[in-house]
Amino acid sequence: MATIHELHKKLVNKEISAVELTNAVIAHKAKVEPTVHAYLSDSHDRALATAKLVDEAIAKGEAISPLAGIPGAIKDNICIKDEPATCASKMLENFVPPYNASVIERLQDNHYISLGKLNMDEFAMG
């Protein structure tokens, strides 16, 4: 398993593309998700679109942030515009925020790749 720093180097050195890395994580997720049930929702299309933007920036020789092109996920109590934010609660099962949390704005500004929302104890009370 590689660190974020190691993956960043591989992206910058064009040893792997952000799209390839994102697809690899999506494939691994598909294998383990039926057993672990970690995700409440996914955003693969948005993730791949961001990965493509990162690859284009690298191809142009632009500097990228250390988080650019790095796939991961966000706990379900963090608001992402137009994605469900249920806090793993039935009470909020239909809530879709019209805004991003500040942390999401920062991650998106740095082209972090979110694959979806992660399960958790209801309202993070566990």
Where are these regions (language model features)?
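Short alpha-helical functional segments enriched in proximate histidine and acidic residues
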Residues: H28, V32, T50, V54, ...
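Flexible, acidic active-site loops/lids enriched in D/E/S/T/G that coordinate Mg2+ and/or position polar
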Residues: H44-L67, I74, E93, P97, ...
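Short glycine/serine-rich loop/turn segments
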Residues: A68-G126
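Conserved SET/PR domain catalytic loop and adjacent active-site segment
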Residues: E15, E62-A63, E83
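Short, polar/charged, Gly/Pro-enriched helix-capping and turn/loop motifs at alpha-helix termini
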Residues: V36-Y39, G61, D121
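An N-terminal boundary/leader segment
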Residues: M1-A49
